[in-house]
Amino acid sequence: MTKITNDLFLKAARKEQVDRIPVWYMRQAGRSQPEYRKLKEKYSLFEITHQPEICAYVTKLPVDQYGVDAAILYKDIMTPLPGMGVDVEIKSGIGPVIHNPIRSFQDVEKLTMFKPEIEVPYVLDTIKLLADDMLDVPLIGFAGAPFTLASYMIEGGPSKNYHQTKSFMYREPEVWAILMEKLGRMTANYLIAQINAGASAVQLFDSWVGALSRADYAEYIRPVIEMIVREVKAVHPTTPIIMQAVGASHLLAEWETMPLDVVGVDWRETITSARKKVPTKAIQGNLDPSTLLAPEKCLKEANRILQEGVLEPGYIFNLGHGVFPEVPPEMLKKLTNYIHERSEILLKKDDIK
């Protein structure tokens, strides 16, 4: 395995002292990079993710080009679902479309057991390739969390309100619990397999869970998240686990009492406020990705965020959501350099101004 010479991200995830703030970006791989767009002219997303050499190349690009302190595996949260019998298609301009949406207990019953080594060997081969030969920074593996996966599976695709998902959850609580159990087992096995293959940390993406109240989260979702985290930690107790959601500030207190290591927040929550709600966790975030299209505003916001981030150990600079395709790659490089240089100055100061 290649030696990790830049461990800033891992130190921050463990709430250790660092000499500069680590930075990486959700959806940093692909998206706006010209090299990626050339690949997309020749290969589909499916083809890229199923070819370890190409997928590893795309994953490594932002490390080389932007100088970020961690790589995140280039995959889609839908990747494991076909291995459970879900007929999913990624449609350009739409996103994931499920051709056999869940409508009943019978549909949930049909979901099969997921074995990562059999169903997604190309994911594990990509990780091994990156960890063994290509990276000197930590590699972050990831999985979609059960609520977000279930919302696609029930709605049949992206949704603005999740009415079908929530009504199914309320109307069929016992069936919902079975669905969560199946998705939870899959997610735990998937994350464990990624760490076994060489991932240094893993992130749970629960993009849409902010649509739930805290009470509903505690009743319908928390048990399965606790199960996932518990199972991963039982096998890999020292591997950092990150929880990332959007519009979910009201759920921070739920995550404080779970054995998570890092909690990601978006621009609706300040770093200082988040720390008060999750004092034992490292914080990741929280620049609004829209500011990347307004360079002056972007750096001003980054400075404001950094001034809060450096006040305590355990801070990782990131976005509150993923990079937009319209973002110029040079802006991400400029921002990365700024975060490194500015945070190094701030961390040396006794009085932050």
Curated annotation (Swiss-Prot):
InterPro entries registered for this protein in UniProt: UROD/MetE-like_sf (IPR038071), Uroporphyrinogen_deCO2ase_HemE (IPR006361), Uroporphyrinogen_deCOase (IPR000257)
Database matches in Gene3D superfamilies: 3.20.20.210
Annotated positions for site Transition state stabilizer: 76
Keyword Lyase: yes
Binding site for substrate: 27-31, 46, 76, 152, 207, 321
Transmembrane annotation, as ranges: none
Biochemical pathway: Porphyrin-containing compound metabolism; protoporphyrin-IX biosynthesis; coproporphyrinogen-III from 5-aminolevulinate: step 4/4
Pfam families reported for this sequence: URO-D (PF01208)
PANTHER family registered for this protein in UniProt: METHYLTETRAHYDROFOLATE:HOMOCYSTEINE METHYLTRANSFERASE RELATED (PTHR21091), UROPORPHYRINOGEN DECARBOXYLASE (PTHR21091:SF169)
Its biological purpose: Catalyzes the decarboxylation of four acetate groups of uroporphyrinogen-III to yield coproporphyrinogen-III.
Name recorded for this polypeptide: Uroporphyrinogen decarboxylase
Organism: Listeria monocytogenes serotype 4b (strain F2365)
Taxonomic path: Bacteria, Bacillati, Bacillota, Bacilli, Bacillales
